[in-house]
């Protein structure tokens, strides 16, 4: 049997832990009967993409990104529209694409997926000229991506510190969208996310219904919310119920043009970059080959009945509260109707 050629690209500074033990784990667990293996460490920003491009040009079968979402994006964008497949050993802070694909979060388990070697053709997106594989967007998540990049520290705690410090003082923007050629009304939004995969990372599901095989992007518009609603937004993100929120508008589309009032930050897979007032996002159907978990469908997590019930309950309360605030005369009637509906 002819061996497949596989290259591991290891980012030594991704995430928060040491990567010193990873080469020995790869050596120990990879099936040497199946693979002719090589390992490379990145030495500077953009190096992973250079190694991946050279590997692709050399006819390597699989290039494995060993790192976080930034490393995965660097490697993946070098492999789009080519026969070379992307593999992932997740070692970052969020690991959004790996989590969406239900890959194991430990090195040994991820290598076992590579040993099976099941490859699927998946979609990817492009925002302006930047390919992305999980999410892109603007508004608060792009603002926080910039803060996170400037912080110099990685990890979930750094991210949460920025979110909590900046979230309640952030000023929403107004966006006008053209979705597959059809214009929408203006939306005032806390953030506008366009998702190819379901989550940001850390199992925070910005687009619970997103699929990487449907040839569509999920557009998620989060309306401004106040401090009392913030815990519910967090709960919905973690419970895969954000699409049920009264503060969320969702669309599916192949091509999106976004107009905003002023230039500012956008992000692609968490990498921030400046952009103008018009932003273009499009899907590329089945444009990248990826090694996937053959057991993913059996493992896919769904919100349980209790989680869904709590989310619907709090969202209903938000609707009632809005009616009470905007129509004080109807206060008693609104609350009475809500209680009767729940008891019927």
Located regions from the model:
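ATP/NTP phosphate-donor binding region
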Residues: 1-63, 297, 307-319, 326-344
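Catalytic core of DAGKc-family lipid kinases
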Residues: 3, 33, 57, 81-85, ...
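ATP/nucleoside-binding phosphotransfer catalytic cores, i.e., glycine-rich phosphate-binding loops
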Residues: 19, 179-181, 211, 221-344
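Short glycine/serine/threonine-rich phosphate/pyrophosphate-binding segments
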Residues: 48, 70-75, 96
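N-terminal glycine-rich "phosphate-gripper" loop used for MgATP/nucleotide binding
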Residues: 65-69
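Glycine-rich phosphate/pyrophosphate-binding beta-alpha loops
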Residues: 137, 141, 193-206, 272
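Gly/Ser/Thr-rich active-site loops/lids in small-molecule metabolic enzymes
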Residues: 150-158, 208-229
